[in-house]
From Swiss-Prot:
It is found in: Virion; Host endoplasmic reticulum-Golgi intermediate compartment membrane. Its phosphorylation state is regulated by the OPG054 kinase and the OPG106 phosphatase. Residues 155-175 have a biased composition (Low complexity). Interacts with OPG136 and its cleaved form. Residues 1-22, 176-186 have a biased composition (Polar residues). Belongs to the orthopoxvirus OPG130 family. This is 39kDa core protein OPG130. The keyword Membrane applies. Residues 1-33, 149-186 are annotated as: Disordered. It comes from Monkeypox virus.
Length: 281
């Protein structure tokens, strides 16, 4: 019996693993708590994943239902336009069979057009002198030329620069019917010459004088300057400098006089104030 019991015990230990129901081990409470939390998180995660999938499916269905339907494209019918057929020009026949040309709908037809129809309907055997009517310049062309010349004279471009003569185009009609236009040449204005001379004052300041000269009105004076010798030119410059110096001295004197007048006026005002104070006391 002892041998049988030992054999049965050894067989049970060798064939039964520790993970079987015969082997039990007490788990740590923290381990059990962690396992419970992990199981809860997994179930919660699967729940939210399922909710997300359902929401995405609903959104896709709503988007598909909201897609606008493509409207039917209108049918465009293109009707070809009839091509106008050119009418051949009539051929002049002898007077016996020549058809009488009738003018079209009466519009503003001038006397020249009536002369032209009369000439076409005349006999081809007539002399050349009778075929050519007396041609006069058209009133319409004359009116256009007159209006053009009038507009050329009346047009003045707005500008803030000094007035200058602009080239005016004049058109005339020749005896042969041609129109010729002429434009005179206008010399552009030269820019004005500006010179500034600064002179030091005895008090340490500087007085500057600016002079401006426009060479266009006196083109002859510019030519005279070009023809002057160097000696005459230097003497003229010295004369101008002396004149400018005299004007500068006058300006300085006027400044001194103004200062003296101001000082005396202030003294008079102070004396009046003191006298008024004494009168009040």
């Amino acid at each position: 019996m002892d041998f049988f019991n030992k054999f049965s015990q050894g067989l049970a230990e060798s064939s039964t693993p520790k993970s079987s129901i015969y082997y039990s081990e007490e788990k740590d409470p923290d381990t059990k708590k962690d396992e419970a939390i992990e199981i809860g998180l997994k179930s919660q995660e699967s729940y939210y994943q399922r909710q997300l999938r359902e929401q995405l499916a609903r959104d896709n269905m709503m988007t598909a239902s909201r897609q606008p339907t493509q409207p039917l494209q209108p049918t465009i019918h293109i009707t070809p336009q009839p091509v106008p057929t050119p009418t051949p020009a009539p051929i002049l026949l002898p007077s016996s069979t020549a058809p009488v040309l009738k003018p079209r709908q009466q519009t503003n037809t001038s006397s020249d057009m009536s002369n032209l129809f009369d000439w076409l309907s005349t006999d081809t055997d007539a002399p050349a002198s009778t075929l050519l009517p007396a041609l006069t310049p058209s009133n319409t062309v004359q009116d256009i030329i007159s209006k053009f010349n009038k507009d050329q004279k009346m047009t003045t471009p707005p500008s803030t620069q000094p007035s200058q003569t602009l080239p005016t185009t004049t058109c005339t009609q020749q005896s042969d019917g041609s129109i010729s236009c002429t434009t005179p040449t206008v010399t552009p204005l030269q820019p004005p010459i500006v010179a500034t001379v600064c002179t030091p004052t005895p008090t340490g300041g500087t007085v500057c004088t600016t002079a401006q000269q426009n060479p266009n009105p006196g083109a002859a004076s510019q030519q005279n300057l070009d023809d002057m010798t160097l000696k005459d030119l230097m003497s003229s410059v010295e004369k101008d400098m002396r004149q400018l110096q005299a004007e500068t001295n006058d300006l300085v004197t006027n400044v001194y006089d103004a200062r003296e007048y101001t000082r005396r006026a202030i003294d008079q005002i102070l004396q009046l104030v003191k006298g008024f104070e004494r009168f009040q006391k």
